[in-house]
């Protein structure tokens, strides 16, 4: 494709924001034979910066400049212009754009400098920067062209670890904003507790459950062996403890906001848990989540049998659930998001289009595409490109 040369004017307006500025500027340009090629506007701390690129007849340059300066005087703003012969074909929409989202509770200049440096080192160019959230976390989104996602991801992972910030990279295009399936772990992700620990406390066996958990972490037991051993310690507990434990569960801050916002935007929310359907079913009803899988406790004659009934929901089963729920909703696996914190979540995090480690163990963070270290589950929304204005914060 050949170059297209045109005489252009780049207009930069800055000043205190107030109603009517944009209207006045374009009214000043309206009498001339002008084509608008590009326009950008941002307001930060009540300061407006408006840039406009126009194509114009070179003979009209002085008249346009005079009218623009008169407009600036009326509005009490500054207007600077740059006129030049420009290859406007290079201004067309770029392919292969990447969205780089930086998430942190406190954004420092050094972190931004290193993010920008990593983008440059990956042969990327920053096309735009937008703040999508300011409190309780800060989210900044960079639109990047020219960089290879794999190379950029590798360099930014070092920046994230160095500065203790969270960074996610996603390609631009329709896939980023299509219907998604978001699958969540439960214990220490959707809720703040570990359900098996709550049940063990009712049996006075908390210390024994902890010993089994530590043995599993040392690799001496796999998840199924560990789960069955821990559930066996619950044998003889009255069925009524399930309701007691349900009353002790608290949602992770931002969990309700996350689920409600995703539902309102047309996405599907699913849940998988190494815990128990007996305990989490009322919570699923409360959150209006119909797609969920968890283990089932054996109950006979009003007591826990100390057994797990049916299929064990281990890491492989969690990944399979992701595929199954996606197929049921006719959602491509590339449009899925998996969120979890433990080793049992690794397979689903690897299988998903975007795997997110939430306040996770180091091995899980290393395996995930992105991570969230802030204590708010709804921070995940920013990694999905959903701005603060679209989020139901009244539910937090």
Predicted feature residues:
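A conserved regulatory-domain signal marking ACT and ACT-like small-molecule sensing domains
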Residues: 1-179
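Long, charged amphipathic helices and adjacent flexible linkers at domain junctions
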Residues: 83-91, 167-180, 213-239, 295, ...
């Amino acid at each position: 494709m050949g170059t297209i040369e045109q005489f252009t004017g780049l207009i930069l307006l800055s000043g205190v924001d107030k109603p009517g500025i944009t209207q006045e500027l374009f009214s000043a340009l309206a009498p001339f034979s002008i084509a608008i090629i590009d326009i950008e506007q941002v307001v930060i701390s009540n300061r407006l910066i408006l840039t406009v690129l126009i194509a114009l007849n070179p003979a009209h340059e002085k008249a346009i400049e005079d009218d623009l300066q008169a407009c600036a005087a009326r509005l009490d703003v500054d207007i600077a212009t740059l006129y030049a012969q420009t290859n406007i074909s290079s201004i067309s929409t770029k392919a292969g754009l990447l969205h780089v989202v930086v998430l942190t509770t406190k954004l420092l200049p050094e972190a931004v400098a290193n993010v920008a440096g990593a983008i440059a080192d990956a042969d990327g160019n920053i096309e735009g920067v937008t703040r999508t959230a300011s409190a309780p976390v800060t989210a900044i989104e960079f639109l990047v062209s020219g960089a290879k996602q794999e190379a950029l991801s590798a360099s930014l992972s070092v920046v994230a670890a160095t500065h203790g910030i969270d960074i996610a990279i996603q390609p631009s295009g329709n896939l980023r904003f299509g219907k998604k399936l978001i699958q969540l772990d439960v214990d220490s992700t959707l809720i703040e507790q570990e359900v098996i620990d709550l049940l063990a406390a009712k049996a006075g066996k908390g210390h024994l459950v902890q010993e089994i958990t530590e043995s599993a972490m040392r690799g001496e037991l796999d998840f199924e062996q560990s789960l069955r051993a821990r559930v066996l310690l619950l044998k003889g507990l009255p069925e009524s403890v399930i309701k007691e434990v349900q009353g002790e569960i608290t949602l992770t801050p931002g969990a309700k906001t996350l689920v409600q916002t995703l539902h309102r935007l047309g996405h599907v929310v699913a849940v998988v848990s190494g815990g128990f359907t007996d305990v989490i079913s009322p919570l699923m009803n409360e959150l209006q989540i119909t797609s969920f899988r968890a283990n089932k406790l054996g109950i006979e004659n009003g007591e826990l049998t100390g057994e797990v009934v049916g299929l064990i929901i281990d890491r492989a089963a969690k990944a399979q659930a992701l595929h199954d729920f996606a197929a049921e909703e006719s959602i491509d696996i590339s449009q899925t998001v998996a969120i979890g914190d433990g080793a049992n979540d690794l397979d689903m995090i690897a299988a998903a289009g975007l795997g997110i480690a939430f306040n996770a163990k180091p091995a899980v963070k290393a395996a995930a595409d992105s991570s969230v270290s802030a204590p708010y589950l709804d921070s995940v929304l920013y990694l999905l490109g959903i701005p603060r204005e679209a989020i139901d914060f009244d539910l937090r």
